[in-house]
């Protein structure tokens, strides 16, 4: 298939990056080397794929959902030994055979699957990862990135920002206007680099699970004060003890609590529960 004859499908949320400066920037921040095994999600017509394959990398494995693009991509790159292609949905495809080989993940994420993509590649609190990615480069909706990077006291602060910041180091490289895509989306995007925190440097898994529990309970009623959300799992006496031991005011709302304070709350909550 000739790429000029292909028309994007709305159901796949296809907005292809056409800004050459941003394409070059992605290659630059990836800092590719001869040992890199790259996973590219949704290569589209292969604009970024071409740039990545021009680098000194070991392998690039691309996963594309759109069957009509598979032949196009194979025709374009089938003579390149470093390239392999798999047709499938990234939300359900089995990566077990290559997951431990992958060093870097690169993707222009469809906005409608951002949450599940983050769960798969950044991970979840309380769950050990079966991979060890060095770097994840995502081009994603700016509003979501604003939420992920938000600190306590911000109206954007939420369970998502705390979970992601506990699991990875995050850096926003730049914001990307709609005009950089074809067709242009209705919103701005951001180019972001995640560096997942290695399993052996993460918090204790049981502690992560308890933090996740507190976040889920608290942010389900984010307008309520902490005292009125945690009373579903703690008595008034326990709440007072936890507030004092953690040096956290329970008249605050969950978005006003720092990551360090959430860790202290979970640690001390576990200690209090062990007394019972």
Curated annotation (Swiss-Prot):
<dbReference type="InterPro" id="IPR011530">
    <property type="entry name" value="rRNA_adenine_dimethylase"/>
</dbReference>
<dbReference type="InterPro" id="IPR023165">
    <property type="entry name" value="rRNA_Ade_diMease-like_C"/>
</dbReference>
<keyword id="KW-0698">rRNA processing</keyword>
<keyword id="KW-0694">RNA-binding</keyword>
<feature type="binding site">
    <location>
        <position position="108"/>
    </location>
    <ligand>
        <name>S-adenosyl-L-methionine</name>
    </ligand>
</feature>
<protein>
    <recommendedName>
        <fullName>Ribosomal RNA small subunit methyltransferase A</fullName>
        <ecNumber>2.1.1.182</ecNumber>
    </recommendedName>
</protein>
<feature type="binding site">
    <location>
        <position position="42"/>
    </location>
    <ligand>
        <name>S-adenosyl-L-methionine</name>
    </ligand>
</feature>
<feature type="binding site">
    <location>
        <position position="17"/>
    </location>
    <ligand>
        <name>S-adenosyl-L-methionine</name>
    </ligand>
</feature>
<feature type="binding site">
    <location>
        <position position="15"/>
    </location>
    <ligand>
        <name>S-adenosyl-L-methionine</name>
    </ligand>
</feature>
<dbReference type="InterPro" id="IPR020596">
    <property type="entry name" value="rRNA_Ade_Mease_Trfase_CS"/>
</dbReference>
<keyword id="KW-0963">Cytoplasm</keyword>
<feature type="binding site">
    <location>
        <position position="89"/>
    </location>
    <ligand>
        <name>S-adenosyl-L-methionine</name>
    </ligand>
</feature>
<keyword id="KW-0808">Transferase</keyword>
<feature type="binding site">
    <location>
        <position position="64"/>
    </location>
    <ligand>
        <name>S-adenosyl-L-methionine</name>
    </ligand>
</feature>
<comment type="function">
    <text>Specifically dimethylates two adjacent adenosines (A1518 and A1519) in the loop of a conserved hairpin near the 3'-end of 16S rRNA in the 30S particle. May play a critical role in biogenesis of 30S subunits.</text>
</comment>
<dbReference type="InterPro" id="IPR020598">
    <property type="entry name" value="rRNA_Ade_methylase_Trfase_N"/>
</dbReference>
<comment type="similarity">
    <text>Belongs to the class I-like SAM-binding methyltransferase superfamily. rRNA adenine N(6)-methyltransferase family. RsmA subfamily.</text>
</comment>
<dbReference type="InterPro" id="IPR029063">
    <property type="entry name" value="SAM-dependent_MTases_sf"/>
</dbReference>
<dbReference type="GO" id="GO:0052908">
    <property type="term" value="F:16S rRNA (adenine(1518)-N(6)/adenine(1519)-N(6))-dimethyltransferase activity"/>
</dbReference>
<keyword id="KW-0949">S-adenosyl-L-methionine</keyword>
<dbReference type="Pfam" id="PF00398">
    <property type="entry name" value="RrnaAD"/>
</dbReference>
<dbReference type="GO" id="GO:0003723">
    <property type="term" value="F:RNA binding"/>
</dbReference>
<dbReference type="GO" id="GO:0005829">
    <property type="term" value="C:cytosol"/>
</dbReference>
<dbReference type="InterPro" id="IPR001737">
    <property type="entry name" value="KsgA/Erm"/>
</dbReference>
<keyword id="KW-0489">Methyltransferase</keyword>
